[in-house]
Amino acid sequence: MFQDNPLLAQLKEKLHSQTPRVEGVVKGTEKGFGFLEVDAQKSYFIPPPFMKKVMHGDRVSAVIQSDKDREVADPETLIEPFLTRFVGRVQKKDDRLSIIPDHPLLKDAIQCRPERSVKHDFQAGDWAVAEMRRHPLKGDRTFYAELTEFITTAEDHLAPWWVTLSRHNLEREAPDVTTPQSMLDEQLEREDLTSLPFVTIDSASTEDMDDALYVEDAGNGALKLIVAIADPTAYVPVGSKLDAVAAERAFTNYLPGFNIPMLPRQLSDDICSLRPHERRPVLACRITLAADGTPADDVQFFAAWIESHAKLAYNDVSDWLETGGSSAWQPENEAIANQIRLLNRLCLARSEWRQAHALVFKDRPDFRFLLGEKGEVLDIIAEHRRIANRIVEESMILANICAATVLRDRLGFGIYNVHLGFDEANAEQAAAVLANHGVTADPLAIATLEGFRNLRRELDALPTQFLDSRIRRFQSFAEVSTTPGPHFGLGLEAYATWTSPIRKYGDMVNHRLLKAIIKGEQSARPADELSLKMAERRRQNRMAERDVGDWLYSRFLQKAAGSEQRFSAEVIDVSRGGMRVRLQENGAVAFIPAPFIHAVRDEMVCSNENGSVQIKGEVAYRVTDLIEVTIAEVRMETRSIVARPVA
């Protein structure tokens, strides 16, 4: 009788339209209940029974109901699931499989089965890639997934690497493509510079040497520098299968312990590598520098043959320069010694030029994991940037500035690294934060390159980096662009890299553009899709490096958990839940929960906006503070380190 009743249908529609609904993101907790976060200020409680229908991170539309004195959210429609493709660990019970996603807030096992194409016989503890197939808000009774790829077994010591690469959908191996053995006929004249004592300076273990340097005294304090860069585009044809593979990978992926090259190792580590006493084709740049480090306008790009006369290591060169030539290591002849002395002079002049006309990053050490046969962490070495590192850095930055200028002036395009500092709105916010701390900044001025440079110099002169950390969050991210633009972070009008073509596809593209200029040929602008792809790949590679690092740091610091061993740590972030710190001696990041900071929660304010922790109205900690901590706990399942401040 009520079937197809238009009045009833109307009433249902009216009730549905009048029921309050909100859209937000589900935030799970370890206690079964959750919250629907609508924005930074507003969230609704989700009771445990309703949480069974959703997963942490799902974007949903929910009905708001009143339950006693509070409003609760009942998820109704799935807008965007948190999980689509994911990695996790397989569980097996009575031959039935389930998978627990590898995520700190996803603890529930999801029923699953292998996809038909996957032939592996899954066992408990195996790592796998899975894809979600069913979701309760899509009309299904339960969550359900299919296993699409076996990663590795529970016992594999190299699981941190394989799991991370699978999570980010990155390659495990070097490209499996036929390696070209002979050079292309590029109709390119090459100068023979094999008699000049070029040198490479790298880590002792480096095999893919892609830059060599030669410098001579030009009189009156001036120097002439030739930067010679390995030439993979002399072997890799545009549009070839190998070119497509390199474009897809975009970068060599450097992870703790090993790298996954962009090009086949035979090319990157041998045929193109600027090995000592081997004749190699290069793309080169000739630059004249005044005594104060200013480059002349007669920059010349050209193709050449060179022969590296020495493979030098950063630490050897630094030791020799820092001890005035009395270190255990000595250059093999006077020609090499003279090159090192002249390169040191060039480095000091260029460093002063950049201090005055651009911006120089503050030195932070790199941390290198010393690994055993089974992937165990034997030690973590802090590698500080020394004079030899700075010689190479200054030479490469100079060469990249020259390429950026030539590409801009001759073509109007290339692969550029662009960083635009503050946009208008963020400049206003940054200026307001600075004003609160007694620093006057004009929002319009700091949105310009010159104004940004002046602000950075002013902040760098302050006794702490606190203010710098406060305004950094208002800055835009660096991006890859085919159009020339400024790089505020470096304080430069334009910056285009070409000095690492073995490791970066964008540098290969710039090589081809520079060669076209040398030959007087026309060039097509690189596709914008390429710059987007490169930016995404760079993000994935950095996340993979961070994830493997988190795993290895957790392994390494397990032995310190619960002990009295003290670590000096820098406060790097404050959130409602506590503080994040970075251990100074090894670079590990640890979390200090709020209850470890102060027992009485109501007496404490943890403010992300202010970058500080206040206790009873007084600032107790703030970002950039150095404090002492002990390791309270290491949670291997989430690769997280929990620290406690030393009272």
Curated annotation (Swiss-Prot):
One of its GO terms (cellular component) is cytosol. SUPFAM superfamilies: Nucleic acid-binding proteins. Keywords: Cytoplasm, Exonuclease, Hydrolase, Nuclease, RNA-binding. The keyword Chaperone does not apply. GO terms for biological process: mRNA catabolic process. Pfam families: OB_RNB, RNB, S1. It catalyses: Exonucleolytic cleavage in the 3'- to 5'-direction to yield nucleoside 5'-phosphates. Transmembrane segments: none annotated. Its EC number is 3.1.13.1. Residues 190-519 form the RNB domain. It comes from the Bacteria. Residues 564-646 form the S1 motif domain. GO terms for molecular function: exoribonuclease II activity; RNA binding. It is found in: Cytoplasm. PANTHER family: EXORIBONUCLEASE 2 (PTHR23355:SF37), RIBONUCLEASE (PTHR23355). Belongs to the RNR ribonuclease family. RNase II subfamily. Involved in mRNA degradation. Hydrolyzes single-stranded polyribonucleotides processively in the 3' to 5' direction. HAMAP family: RNase_II. This is Exoribonuclease 2. It comes from Erwinia tasmaniensis (strain DSM 17950 / CFBP 7177 / CIP 109463 / NCPPB 4357 / Et1/99).
